[in-house]
Amino acid sequence: PTKSMEVPGGSSITVTATALKGSNVTASLGGTKVKLKQQSNFVQDENGTKLDENSDFAVYSGKISIPASTSKVQSLGRIKVYASFNGLSATMSGASVSVSAVIPTPEPTPTQPDTTEHPSTDKPSDTTDGGTGGNVDFNPSKMLTPYAYAGVAGRSKMCEITSLCETMPANVVDDCVPYSSPLPAGTFDYISSEYTYGGSKYYRLASGRNILASKTKLIAQGYNLPQNKVSVVSSSSNSDATTIKFGFTWKVPFNVAVKNQSYIPSSQASGGSLYAVTAFNGKYVDITFSHSGNVVGKINVSGSKIVSAAQWITDSKAKTLTLRLTLRTPGRFYGYSVGYTSDGCLTLKIKAKPASSLSGSVIMIDAGHGGNDSGAICAYNPNSSKKYEKQINLLLAQKIKAKLEARGATVIMTRSNDTYVSLDARANMGRTKNPDMFIAVHCDSSESASPMGTTAYYYQAYSFPLASAVHKRIVSAYKSSIYSGAGSATLNKIDRGTNMYPFRVTRIEECPAVLIEYGFVSNIRECKLLWSDSVQERLAQATVDGIADYIASN
């Protein structure tokens, strides 16, 4: 980073620098020094632009830990980066960094305990039950807010989420992670501290996460609220989903995360990702409610196709309640939706397996870029009117759509012509249109003309199986037909892997979501192939076959 920033204590800052390949690169801040690691296949931006692989330079990256916050702002000075190579050395300065001060937050006052039914504080309690589940009286009009006195002494700095807001763990300053889920509009929380990064203001919440301040309404003197009680209003299952409705004393923050998932070491992952996988093997879905200590009502999952058991876990020290839903089959998960519905309940839907074949599946195809967002410029142009990545993306997407529909699938397009659709709007379609899967169609680009090949990207671990299945088919199509007869020097460059990266359109929870880079438009030979109608047909067929493989094996 280069802009001045004020960051929360206990977090970390990612420092990146460009230096000659093979250099020794370190970064220092406030007496802390770290070694930066050279990164491979580094993605520069949301467009997936790659660095020139043949360049003498590479990107180096590492994290600097920030000391704990105190009652006053602490100045750490400027980030300094040192690089040395074969007797040459250079030093550069980056952002000026300070540590934000702590804002005192109150201890929630417990509500009157409900002695008729609540979880054990020592171990998980099984709340699976027959019948409809829930059946607890809940009146949303009686929910408390920080805008009115709630019987608890004192007032605090608080905020209300005003629109769906992505979150980051408290120790992360500027990056999203798959185990930190978004918060819906209407959620309240105490503000522990605030900081600025990249010109944007962030709040660190008492629940242990960081959010963009622009997604909230500040309540400078909010009335303190009591400890929350969770009421299970209802639970049911059908062929589409397992649905659980919750009522609250007040709209507390919560987090949804797939647990017991294995990740590969960052040193083995493309770009050094901390959350890359080689398979999806998650066993549980944990829904953790902050500022909470009591629950009433039972959950019925007896008819669920996706969940086999439900347990409540309490953590009295952290003041959280966690509902653990055990997956009926480990490694089989198809997404979830959660938000407040018109009845005032927080409604969680765990999606069941949508269909057993392409026929009956609902698939969203996202043709990347469009309108005034042209994407990358093509190195080869069939004629003066065909020269942008956005055009190839749409042609490919239309062919994929036709082939899917021919096999009985329903296809939703984020765009069907040359129009601009924002990244947020595309992601929102994936959240609200209820597709079974989301596939973004893109072409790659580099600062150099030499890189070639195809890459698949995922964000959530449960999106990896779809990304991998489609990628394998596309690689096979290139090797067996599109580049048929090519030498090993070409064939060995085709498979660029199935990689984790937080593209905006893959950061959705409602279904498996992937982004496919079909080839490099910056490579003249490959760009010419990507403009070929017959090659587009083969790539579209490979995509459809990959989707079918995913459905059959998952």
Language-model segments: which ranges?
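A short, glycine/acidic-enriched catalytic loop
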Residues: 373-388, 445-472
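Active-site-adjacent mobile loop/cap segments within catalytic or ligand-binding domains
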Residues: 377, 438-447, 457, 492-554
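Active-site histidine-acidic residue metal-binding/catalytic motifs
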Residues: 343-429, 433-435, 452
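Short linear recognition/processing motifs and adjacent strand/loop elements at protein termini
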Residues: 1-11, 16-18, 22-26, 30, ...
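Solvent-exposed loop/turn segments at secondary-structure junctions
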Residues: 369-372, 416-421, 443-448, 461-464, ...
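Solvent-exposed, polar/charged alpha-helical surfaces in well-ordered, non-transmembrane soluble domains
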Residues: 390-406, 428, 432, 464, ...
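Soluble non-cytosolic domains of exported or imported proteins
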Residues: 173, 177, 183, 387-395, ...
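Active-site-adjacent substrate-binding region
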Residues: 465-499
